[in-house]
Regions:
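A short, gly/pro- and small-residue-rich
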Residues: 135-153
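Generic structural marker for isolated residues within well-ordered, non-membrane alpha-helices
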Residues: 11
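Conserved strand-to-helix beginnings and helix N-cap segments that scaffold or border functional pockets
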Residues: 5, 63-66, 136-140
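ABC ATPase nucleotide-binding domains
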Residues: 15-113, 124-128, 154-158, 162-168, ...
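ABC ATPase "signature
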Residues: 1-4, 8
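A short, aliphatic-rich alpha-helical micro-motif
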Residues: 119-120
């Protein structure tokens, strides 16, 4: 391919040429693209009957959460993510089922509907430490809808929601409602995984065995 590095180093193009999933990020010093090749077996293997987590992420907040959940034995799906978002690239590299929206576009009715259908099949909803603006506020609305329909909600909050709310308070309002109705808050990934342990069959079985020993 010919063109600038930014034009050529596109994940879809690289994957088509080299037949392997890749993740691209910008070098924080030079701004040039960095490409990470991921072997197909880089993602932990999860049995088909494992519990499923629907992750609400964006802006790079989800990649570590995806991998940690997979390593803990969860199946993972995610959305709604804008194309070109690093979390969308990570989801594609890990071969996760995910719902996308066009770059820099607000979440459309169609994307929201498809994300809601996907979330409906999940055993838990996880909200990553993502920023929320008018374009992705519907992701929080989706979490609220899922909570009202009986889904357990868990949130990773290493930064207060007030510092991530770019909606003139709408995100904070939804967040307070989620907390009020039982959303579990974790300050870091290990704590999040501990919150999820009762829903993870292997962990739950291990805890039961330990308790009866």
């Amino acid at each position: 391919a010919q063109g600038t590095p930014d034009a050529v180093m596109q994940p879809a193009l690289l994957e088509a040429v080299y037949h392997t999933p890749v993740l691209t990020q910008s070098n924080p010093t030079t701004g040039r693209p960095l490409v990470f090749a991921l072997a197909p077996d880089d993602a932990p293997q999860v049995p088909p009957d494992a519990p499923t987590a629907f992750v609400i992420a964006g802006g790079g907040s989800g990649a570590a959460v995806y991998y940690a959940l997979l390593a803990a034995g969860w199946r993972v799906c995610t959305g709604v993510l804008n194309l070109l978002d690093t979390d969308e690239e990570a989801a594609r590299a890990l071969r996760l089922e995910h719902i996308t929206e066009q770059p820099f576009s607000p979440i459309s009715d169609d994307a929201y509907r498809r994300a809601r259908q996907l979330a409906q099949t999940a055993d838990a909803i996880i909200i990553a430490d993502a920023p929320f603006g008018r374009g992705n506020l519907r992701n929080l609305e989706l979490a609220r809808w899922a909570q009202e329909h009986g889904k357990p909600i868990f949130a990773l909050e290493s930064r207060p929601i007030e510092t991530r709310d770019f909606t003139d308070g709408a995100a904070c309002t939804l967040w307070r409602l989620l907390v009020q109705d039982g959303m579990a808050i974790a300050p870091d990934l290990p704590t999040l995984l501990e919150h999820l342990a009762p829903l993870t069959p292997n962990r739950a079985a291990a805890s039961s065995t330990s308790a009866t020993a």
